[in-house]
Amino acid sequence: MQEIYLGVGMFTIIVLVLVAIIMFAKSKLVPQGDVEILINDDEDKKIVTQPGTKLLGALANAGIFVSSACGGGGSCGQCRVTVKEGGGDILPTELDHITKREAREGCRLSCQVNVKQDMEIELPEEVFGIRKWDCTVKSNDNVATFIKEFIVQLPEGEEVPFRAGGFIQIEAPPHHVKYKDFDISEEYHGDWDRFGFFDVESKVDEEVVRAYSMANYPEEKGIIMLNVRIATPPPNDLSLPAGKMSSYIFSLKPGDKVTISGPFGEFFAKDTDAEMVFIGGGAGMAPMRSHLFDQMRRIKTDRKVSFWYGARSKKEMFYVEDFDMLAEENENFDWHVALSDPQPEDNWEGDTGFIHNVLYERYLKDHDAPEDCEFYMCGPPVMNAAVINLLKDLGVEDENIMLDDFGG
């Protein structure tokens, strides 16, 4: 019995010693107390936080929202800040988005920077105009088989001061949604049934943040309108994860609450007299609509403007009446659609094929100076790459190719 007591006692002593060693090491290795982050050399913008957090989160907790389309995953490369002091060495995960020259100048991804000590950083002044709003879902209707027009109502009297081509970030709490509960318009059920998508579920255990471009333009006030394409699992393996945010948005119904922040953006129109050519596909319609309505309705531009949109079939075309109306109102605007897979019931007599080929054959091939035009594009990565290759072959410089790379 005495040996048992002795063994238990020795074991307890060993455990206590190990705990003491760990606590001592933690006190030496992990910073204790508050950390101060000085922003733009302005004492009024200094924030105080606890060590051990990411810089992106520390700023957000202080009401300073840095753009992060991937929600802090390190994949979008948007949450750039300049770290003047503190922050440690740049990480390999950052070097995919930051050049060596930028790194030497202190450029970092705030989602990858651990706050361990007092820091000095620089942020663009426009960051301080970014806010959060608790909004109410106004409508959430299909405009194509896998795309919803998602409209949220801002609080009474509130506006998001965005520019055409800008985007907001939307937050999703932990959730478990079932695709069978989605409100999908009857005309689109065919593909959903055929691929078995109504059997899919999406379970997310952490908060998610994603970015979406506005489809409304600044004079459509009091709302934020998005075009959201759901990221389903591949039909041949429905066990793979579905898109976290898009699944959540598809589950929302009028009256539901949702939090957004913004405005963000850099996909803005240049203030020149050059001809403007817009090319879009899929949910890349959103910034196209925003830009085109802004140019024709608010700015009332006299520049020559055209819009080229690629869709799979007639069922995937949307905002047709909107653009027909703009074309009727403005002699300097025209728009074109090409269907890559028109269905027999479409009775389609318009252009067919991929939009970059149609753009070339119908317009750019005989254009006097395509290199003098400004090209604005947003669509699936394959479309973007094809258009960019076409423009490069035509001698268009990088400075005249503007890309909203939501799928990159």
Curated annotation (Swiss-Prot):
Residues 33-127 form the 2Fe-2S ferredoxin-type domain. It is a single-pass membrane protein. It catalyses: a ubiquinone + n Na(+)(in) + NADH + H(+) = a ubiquinol + n Na(+)(out) + NAD(+). This is Na(+)-translocating NADH-quinone reductase subunit F. Binds 1 [2Fe-2S] cluster. It comes from Idiomarina loihiensis (strain ATCC BAA-735 / DSM 15497 / L2-TR). Composed of six subunits; NqrA, NqrB, NqrC, NqrD, NqrE and NqrF. HAMAP family: NqrF (MF_00430). One of its GO terms (cellular component) is plasma membrane.
